[in-house]
Amino acid sequence: MEGDSNPLYEQRFNAAVKVIQNLPPNGSFQPSHDMMLKFYSYYKQATQGPCNIPRPGFWDPVGKAKWDAWSSLGEMPKEEAMAAYVDDLKLILESMPVSSEVEELLQVIGPFYELVDEKRKITQVSDLSTGFGNLLSSPPKCVTKSIIRTMEMNGNLEGYPIKTAETLKVKSIDLEDREDDDDEDEEGERDEVEEFKEVEKASQPKKRVSAGRPKGPVSNGSISQHKGLSNGTHGSKSDLNRQESEENTEHMNHDGGIVELNGHLNSEKDKEEDVSSSHHVASDSDSEVYCDSVDQFGGEDGSEIHMNRSLEVLEESHSTPSSTGDIRSQDDELLGREEGVQHGGEDGRGSRGGAQRRELPVKRSDSSVVRRGRGSRSPASGSGSAGPQQGSGGDGERWGADGPMTENLNEQIICALARLQDDMQSVLQRLHTLEALTASQARSLALPSDYLTTPANRNKKKPSWWPFDVSLGTVAFAVVWPFVVQWLIRVYVQRRRRRIN
């Protein structure tokens, strides 16, 4: 009953001390040394007050660490130390195993989790979101300008569909209706609408070039429609985006015009096959863009300059009041030029097949020809091939130089194969020499030793049973000669005695 008379903070402190003191030494939860030092300092401060004992010597590092932790609390009151002890234990209470001491502590502490009012939290979040609603819903003006500038620099604005601009226009108008309260946002959105209108006006003549299909024949004998603009990346970069290429293909399929190819009339089925083959000829993947060499960038720049000039002429012809026949004839001339630039003077499927056969030894896929707007490399591929190659502004020179490049590549391959053959022959010769040496060594080891020794060595050869390195005759001479010398000396002495007598 004494525990009930104690203050609540002291009861909690005593229960927490029991939990720490009864932790199993090899249990699932093991507090760190820093945590135990903190509990020790709070315990000493709560039970004995401030630290007033001398610091241990250097030979007691554990005592020094405990003294430092205790003395760091300074003049902290006992009640505050008890409360800090319990608060630190609450942080690790969930990770400790449940025992009787933990249950007792939970009963003494009670529910110590923080209660959160969900309704208040929701209203606070909504209040915060209303403040940023204008910024989150409307794109900034600078971002829109940067997007338009990036599209103009990359050349994607030419083939950018007008539907997207109209969709953005509708979205911006909806944003104006929603945010009538903020005058600055309305002005920014009106500026965006005006910018999108300018983009739409700027892209209308380009849309006419990329989507319009005049049905008149082309002067160079190629396909009479805008096949060059939807077939290469020099015009609207449509092959880099598969969706735009599909839209161009659908537009060509629904156009309903008659295609004139080398003086023959083909049906809509032939036109669809031609368009699909131009987009999917020898391509490993529709999403990949193949680049033969670094020289393509210069060619692309030249063709893009040519197309920009042709588009400017189209805009001038569209702005000046002229008859429909003049505009159509002017468009036909421009489309004929661009057809030559994009296809290099191809005269239909036959010339493309010739281009494929020409490129097969060089191991270059025809997809790069279609995707980069490069046509046949053969100078005699069609009737209109000479004109575009001379007037393309940069691609023609590169196309004309591809023939010597192909020959140089073939010569390099032949030289490499000849060197490889020489190296293989030298390796084979060395291998034969090595095999001959190995065979001779094997034969020499297989021959008996009598054929390898000279007659003198054969006579001096020691027997197989002799264990020493010295020959048998040498050993016999070394053993016999003392006896022979002694016998000779004895004979000499006997003869001398006879003479004296």
Swiss-Prot record:
Q: Which residues form a coiled coil?
A: 406-437
Q: Does the keyword section mention Protease? A: no
Compositional bias annotation for Basic and acidic residues: 236-254, 266-283, 328-366
Q: Which GO terms describe its biological process?
A: fatty acid metabolic process; pexophagy
A GO CC term attached to the entry: cytoplasm
What's the protein name?
A: Acyl-CoA-binding domain-containing protein 5A
User: Subcellular localization, per the record?
Assistant: Membrane
Fetch the Pfam families from UniProt: ACBP
Disordered: annotated span: 173-405
Residues annotated as binding an acyl-CoA are 20-29, 40-44, 66, 85
Which CDD domains did the record assign? ACBP (cd00435)
Q: Where are the transmembrane segments?
A: 465-485
Q: Which PANTHER family match?
A: ACYL-COA-BINDING DOMAIN-CONTAINING PROTEIN 5, ACYL-COA-BINDING PROTEIN, ACBP
Which InterPro entries does the protein's record reference?
ACBD5, Acyl-CoA-binding_prot_CS, Acyl-CoA-binding_protein, Acyl-CoA-binding_sf, FERM/acyl-CoA-bd_prot_sf
Skewed-composition ranges (Acidic residues): 176-195
Instruction: Give the GO molecular function terms.
Output: fatty-acyl-CoA binding
Q: Which organism is it from?
A: Danio rerio (Zebrafish)
Q: What does this protein do?
A: Acyl-CoA binding protein which acts as the peroxisome receptor for pexophagy but is dispensable for aggrephagy and nonselective autophagy. Binds medium- and long-chain acyl-CoA esters.
Q: Membrane topology type, per the record?
A: Single-pass membrane protein
Query: Where the protein is mainly located, per its record?
Result: membrane
Which stretches does UniProt call biased (Low complexity)? 376-389
